[in-house]
């Protein structure tokens, strides 16, 4: 039996070992297909990362698909039922690294656009593709750099679907119409090292910090809103001491992260945490990593089109959620346009035996194509 166009393309992409930041030729495959549709292609290589921007049309609105060709490492091969880079169908599921996150989505995007343009060669507006090989890694030279390049020349995306695996039980049951912001602090509290038997000759930074850390951990940062839960403060890593039981440490290192709603900003978080540490008279260094601002698409033509497109395939409307981690949508949202995430079921992403239901790929392709029809068909 011959594979469908979307299944054949998904298999081709999965077979390429594109572990971050490698692309392994995935983008060349997509570019060849898009060139045949009349897209103008701009390859953007930054350091070790390969990206491309493709556009068909010059008029507004500019609708874009965004995604990534890179995947996380497969881990121990012996734990997989099949080779992670040899796509295999088992009981109606396509197995392979990237099947759900997110080479399946990429295949659906390309085939959906091929079908849409075949029926609508003179469509309204413009269609774009923003593809990177740096989403699973440090996200330094990927989507963010492409977005900066486009913004510098005044080329802003009006509407964007990011193909991240948003679904939970059934493809299309969840659309992410926003994401929380993320900020990480690396705090080093300074003390004076000494012998535990002579505490008066030392200054224990752990003891000095406990009240401040407790205050930060129990602070109510906000109450959230209709779209976001309250801001979360979590401590993932702490370290101090030499490993010896008789040495008071000279430094105490605490790493913390906040996932925050649109009720807060990076600036407010930095100010409040700095004020708390200063109030407790700590001697400290604090380095910040700004991972992304929160974004929200609560209304607009894109959201209406995506909800309708999912309903036409599933006969039920998707839930609109902002849960989960960050995605490249946070960078695209800087352009001021509407951004949503719609992709496969996420139950097996980053796991051994990652897989996606073959029928879900066909349904997702229909959802993407229907969205295009709602937005750009004349």
Curated annotation (Swiss-Prot):
Cofactor(s) the protein requires to work: Zn(2+); Co(2+)
Active site residues according to the UniProt entry: 70, 135
UniProt EC number: 3.5.1.18
An annotated Gene Ontology molecular function: cobalt ion binding
Catalytic activity: N-succinyl-(2S,6S)-2,6-diaminopimelate + H2O = (2S,6S)-2,6-diaminopimelate + succinate
BP GO terms, sorted: diaminopimelate biosynthetic process; L-arginine biosynthetic process; lysine biosynthetic process via diaminopimelate
Binding positions (Zn(2+) 1): 68, 101, 164
Superkingdom of origin: Bacteria
CDD domains: M20_DapE_proteobac (cd03891)
Pathway as given in its UniProt record: Amino-acid biosynthesis; L-lysine biosynthesis via DAP pathway; LL-2,6-diaminopimelate from (S)-tetrahydrodipicolinate (succinylase route): step 3/3
Enzyme superclass (EC): hydrolase
Coiled coil: none
InterPro entries: ArgE/DapE_CS, Bact_exopeptidase_dim_dom, DapE_proteobac, Peptidase_M20, Peptidase_M20_dimer, Peptidase_M20A
Cofactor: binding comment: Binds 2 Zn(2+) or Co(2+) ions per subunit.
Alphabetic keyword roster: Amino-acid biosynthesis, Cobalt, Diaminopimelate biosynthesis, Hydrolase, Lysine biosynthesis, Metal-binding, Zinc
Self-association and partners: Homodimer.
Protein task: Catalyzes the hydrolysis of N-succinyl-L,L-diaminopimelic acid (SDAP), forming succinate and LL-2,6-diaminopimelate (DAP), an intermediate involved in the bacterial biosynthesis of lysine and meso-diaminopimelic acid, an essential component of bacterial cell walls.
Family: Belongs to the peptidase M20A family. DapE subfamily.
Protein name: Succinyl-diaminopimelate desuccinylase
Organism: Vibrio campbellii (strain ATCC BAA-1116)
Gene name as annotated: dapE
